């Protein structure tokens, strides 16, 4: 049984964080209530705040607290956490805000969260010392990245991750692979990579005399895929795409409809201003970008550390907010490789049962 902050995970499933605004309190709370681990995406989480354009940083800080509180009302005793990208501006401040809000866990990817334990420890100093620190989980895609994290945390922070999320090449949104790696990592090849990462986790679990559960993510949209993940040695699975077409998902109906209407051929790779390939549903917006067009940013809301507004082909904040709020055809609709399999709306609890029954 996986334990997160002394709470037992009743169902071995994490709902993946999806931003901007796809997995907020509604979805995360519903998943936690159903026995899984619900994940709120911190990416531009305050986009609905009336003051967002004026001061996105402060709006995001307010929303981290308010979204967590709303999710906790839905699931008073469930496991609820945050996904916070390392590539975000104010990453450290957002981590501290999530800790102070009371998050059960933190999942950090889009870069290596080398100093996450230090940031969290500092945040905990200002809190009631009887409170438990959140569980910390890096997102890794290769054995190499896993070893880098484990070695660094051991040397600098004298600790190991509380669990690890392995994100495979079939995942949605930003991918931890270069485009040429995506063609290299066939199903069989990546299986070997998964087994190697699991071995790294087991090695350090023995070294630190603690359990380090492994959560496998990417393309897990059917019971068969879930069963296969467990057969490889995963302790739990993470699913995201399947949860988009749920009634509780925080995205607009138009966003969900893009999933429901998508064919297998509509799932494409698009370059992101983050510097990584991303997987998305093909639409008017993606056609413009992939044909060499540019949609110049109107304003900068400071979402990414290394963004050059004068150079990027589009503003990812604008593109994601446009789609999630209802204008899906003119925005970026991130998705997993199996989004085309989504053909009806359902409840989050039903998704969990269909994957784990």
Language-model segment annotations:
Residues 3-7, 19, 164, 217, ...:
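Generic detector of short alpha-helix boundary/capping microenvironments
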Residues 14, 171-215, 221-357:
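Conserved active-site-proximal phosphate/metal-binding subdomains
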Residues 22, 220-221:
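Residue-level detector of alpha-helix initiation sites
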């Amino acid at each position: 049984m996986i334990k997160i902050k002394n709470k037992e995970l009743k169902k071995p499933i994490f709902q993946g964080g999806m931003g901007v605004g796809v997995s907020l309190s509604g979805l995360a709370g519903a998943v936690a209530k159903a026995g899984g681990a619900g994940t709120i995406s911190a990416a531009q989480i305050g986009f609905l705040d009336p003051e967002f354009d004026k001061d996105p940083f402060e709006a995001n800080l307010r929303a981290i607290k308010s979204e967590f509180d709303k999710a906790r009302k839905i699931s008073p005793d469930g496991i609820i956490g945050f996904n916070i990208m390392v590539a975000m501006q104010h990453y450290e401040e957002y981590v501290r805000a999530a800790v102070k809000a009371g998050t059960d866990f933190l999942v950090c990817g889009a870069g290596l969260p080398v100093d996450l334990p230090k940031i969290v420890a500092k945040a905990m100093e200002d809190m009631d010392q009887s409170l438990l620190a959140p569980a910390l989980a890096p997102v890794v895609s290769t054995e190499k990245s896993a070893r880098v994290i484990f070695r660094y945390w051991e040397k600098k922070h004298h600790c190991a991750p509380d669990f690890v999320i392995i994100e495979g090449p079939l995942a949605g949104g930003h991918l931890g692979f270069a485009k040429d790696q995506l063609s290299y990592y066939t199903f069989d090849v990546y299986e070997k990579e998964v087994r190697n990462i699991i071995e790294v986790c087991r090695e350090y679990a023995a070294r630190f005399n603690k359990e380090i559960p492994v959560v496998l993510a990417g393309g897990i949209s059917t019971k068969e895929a879930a069963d296969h993940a467990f057969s490889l040695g995963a302790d739990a699975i993470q699913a995201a795409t399947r949860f988009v077409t749920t009634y509780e998902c925080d995205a607009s109906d138009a966003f969900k409809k893009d999933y429901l209407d998508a064919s297998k051929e509509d799932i494409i790779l698009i370059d992101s201003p983050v510097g990584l390939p991303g997987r998305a549903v093909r639409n008017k917006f993606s056609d413009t970008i992939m044909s060499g067009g540019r949609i110049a940013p109107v304003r900068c809301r400071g979402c990414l550390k290394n963004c050059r507004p004068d150079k990027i082909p589009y503003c990812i904040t604008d593109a994601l907010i446009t789609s999630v709020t209802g204008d899906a055809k003119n925005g970026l609709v991130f998705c997993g490789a199996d989004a085309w399999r989504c053909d009806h709306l359902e409840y989050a609890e039903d998704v969990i049962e269909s994957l784990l029954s």
